[in-house]
Amino acid sequence: EKGQDAKIGAVIMNANPFTLGHRYLVEQAAAAVDLLHVFVVSEDASLVPFSVRRQLVAEGCADLSNVVCHETGPYMISNATFPSYFLKDSDTVIRSHAKLDIQVFLRIAKALSVTDRFVGEEPFSQVTGIYNQVMAEELASTGLNCHIIPRKADEDGAISASEVRCLIRDGNFEALKKKVPACTFRY
């Protein structure tokens, strides 16, 4: 049980698949708070099935003692609350869906006494970039701190799950090994 002044953080990730970039985000967030809730998107609309993604995140964060992994269920970043994430709609629709999803998150955050929300910088996905912008705006009025963490980069630039999926598809396991934790590479 954490004290009343504890900093409690939250990260929501699809982790399709779990990369060194995801691990970096969790490390940065965990270092900044007393307790970090990591939510893995439950929607099974990804290359890597949810059960595997959740296992990879849990295994990839097992050494971080202040991290607790959860599934989002049908409540956060789901087809019910944020269909634009899966459909890639217009900016206006994305913004309204993001606001709805963030309102759901705020209810869960209140129940878990979350004080800080962490997201990775998003240079690649328009939908996620808009979501992060709306989230920063919405959280500013609630007293929740919003932290946008710069992406982990390697010699090829920012590490992205999209790039990792391409490496998997192309069978480029040498490059893949440099971008994912051992648990993901074994998968």
Regions found by a protein language model. Give the residues of each.
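Nucleotidyltransferase catalytic core that binds NTPs
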Residues: 1-187
